[in-house]
Amino acid sequence: MGYKDLKFSEDSLFLVTGCAGFIGSNLCEAILNMGYRVRGLDDLSTGLQKNVDMFLDNPNYEFIKGDIKDFDTCMKACEGVDYVLNQAAWGSVPRSIEMPLFYCANNIQGTLNMLEAARQNGVKKFVYASSSSVYGDEPKLPKKEGVEGNLLSPYAVTKMCDEEWAKQYTRHYGLDTYGMRYFNVFGRRQDPNGAYAAVIPKFLKQLLSGETPTINGDGRQSRDFTYIENVIEANLKSCLATSEAAGQAFNIAYGGREYLIDIYYGLTEALGIDVEPNFGPDRAGDIKHSNADISKAKELLGYDPEWSFDRGIKAAIEWYKENL
C-alpha cells in the first residue's frame, strides 16, 4: 500500500520536469523524503518559485531553470538520471482552445525532446503525464484504456500525441515509457488562482475569501477526483514496473465518481459557510461525466490507491485553510 516503503538504488537520481508545479513539486517532496536525489527542471512559466525554494536547502535537490522546448536543456537535465518523471506541460482545456500553436510546441515537441534526451542518456524509466481528456466524447463509463472517442480539445490532442510518441520510443529504442492518464487530480499546492484554476482549489479560495463561486453548467457533471498521494504512488510504482508493462498508458484515479454540486455543498458545510453558488455556461471542450476503470494500473503497476475522495478532500481543506 502507498509508496513510502518502495526501494530504489541508494544513489538513484530522479528528474522531475515541471518541478515547480502542483504535481511536480509533490513528487519532489515525496522522493526527497524517501532519501533519494532529485533534479528539478522548470521554466517557471506556470510553476511557482516558492515550490522550488522550499527544497533548496536539501543537499539531495538540484534545480535547473530551463524550457523543455530547448533540446540542449533536456540533454543537460537528463545527464546521469535513472528515472524521468515528465510533468512539464501546459494544462487547461479552455486555454488550449485559445492557444493551439503554443500547446503543440510545449506539450508535444517538449515531450519529444525529453524522450530523445532520455534515450540518449540511457534513462531506465520514463514516466510521463497524460490525461483523461484522451477519452474525448466516448460516453461509456467507466473509462477503459483502448476505448477512446473523438478528441474534444487541442489539449487532448497533445496528450494523445505524447502517448503515441512514447509508444514509438518503447517499440524502436527500448526506452521503458509509462503514461499516466490523470483524472482530476487535487490536493496541496494546487494553484487556486487565475481563470484556468481547477475547480476544488478555486472553490476553496473563493469561499474562504468571502466570494461567491460560479459553477459552470448545472453542477450535475461528475468526475473521478484523485488525491495527489495516489498520483505520487502511481508515478513511483511505474519506476519499478516491468518492461512488459512499458509502452502503455494507464488510468490513474481512485475509481469513484463525485458530482460538482455535491462537492460544492460539501465544502460549504465543512467550512461552515452558507452561500448559494452562481451558475454559468458549460465550458467548451468539457465532457459531462468521467469515471475510471483502474484495473489495468492495479494489475501491471501494482497501483493500489489509499486515498479516497472523502479522505483527500478533508486533507485539502485543512491545507488551504492554513496556506491561503
What does each model-identified segment do?
Residues 1-185, 239, 305-307, 315, ...:
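N-terminal Rossmann-like NAD(P)+-binding domain of SDR-like oxidoreductases, especially those catalyzing
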Residues 192, 198-199:
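Conserved catalytic loops of nucleotide-sugar-dependent glycosyltransferases that act on lipid-linked
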